[in-house]
Amino acid sequence: MALIPATVHQLAGKAQSLLAEKSVRAQIASSSRELDQADAVLFFAEGPGQFYQLDVWIETFHRLAAAGLKTGVIAMDARSARLVLENSSLPVLFSHSIEHIETRLRAIGARAICYVNNSQRNFTMLRFNGPAHVHLNHGESEKASMVSHQLKAYDYACVAGPAAVERIADSISRFDLAALVQIGRPQLDGLKPAEPSSTTRVLYAPTWEGDSAAMAYSSLPDYGERILAQLDADPNFEVRFRPHPKTGDASPAAKKAAAALKSAYSHLLDPVHDPGQSLVWADVAICDISAMAYDAVALNVPLILAGDRESRLRSGLPSAQLLGRANGLADRVAQLAASGVSGRQKQLSQYFFATTEPGAATKKLGDLLRSF
């Protein structure tokens, strides 16, 4: 019976996409945003519910375009195409016909197609011979999804650093490690420094509940209330709450918990669009095993890690930086903010990221895409 609501939701999404097509095509034409030349394109077949996966790459591709690489976006859902138009200046090719997309890419001479997730619909595009197929993913973490056997389908997979190479080598049998390119995290290159503050700024950014037991990393249902209540009660803290955009998609209980927290702590909801910019703002970040935690490491933001699953990140951090049951959290946050990034966290940065030098990751990605 659980499949019925999901099926209805999918059908409703398809109907909404069809209804949006005419206006989106008109918007592309009126704004002269049609993709008519490109060296490298971002491919995205999903609807707006997964748009965050593409969104984290848009600014990077703007920077690559400014450096002379012709870039653009292919969207197979009209609603996602509209979001690209509204949130970027990149040219767009909207079509739900793979044959049409292949014809257009062949005509404009695209040399690389980049993928931001593990969507099954990527495989409709992967049949296209000629351009290099490059998997980018949308974040670095030790979630189970980061070692998908699907990686073998791509010509190259960009990874953050040595940890990802080690993880893939250990987890995916018969994988050609020569296909892995360590680039760091280009999404973090364009971030702006935060203005100084007299208070301690704390970001709580839990991940979503995942679509399987293996992906259930969220602290929100069990600890969200305890975390936010302690932090909000302390006048020395300025707190922002940033739940993952997919929270509640796979679990009614998680959806109910998230709705309750958003209502009770609406004054804490993070107003910032870019998740990396939210981390730059923070003096301390409280995160689950997710890209937010690893980006905090890359950005030298003192991290308190939630969850008790074994990971290299968890075992590498001092015990004081493990959330546990969130007891005495206010004092622990204050102490961590005062002491700054621990030496062990700094060592983890070198392990997880090939580079954290500003601009270097974007250059590494640009060099790869130009090489085709």
Predicted regions and their residues:
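Short acidic-hydrophobic, aromatic-tinged amphipathic segments that line or gate anion-handling sites
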Residues: P91-S97, G184, S266-V272, A320-R332
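Conserved catalytic-core segment of nucleotide-activated headgroup transferases in glycan assembly
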Residues: F51-A65, L69, P186-A258, A354-K363
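Active-site and donor-binding regions of nucleotide-sugar-utilizing enzymes
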Residues: E46-G47, F51, E59-L188
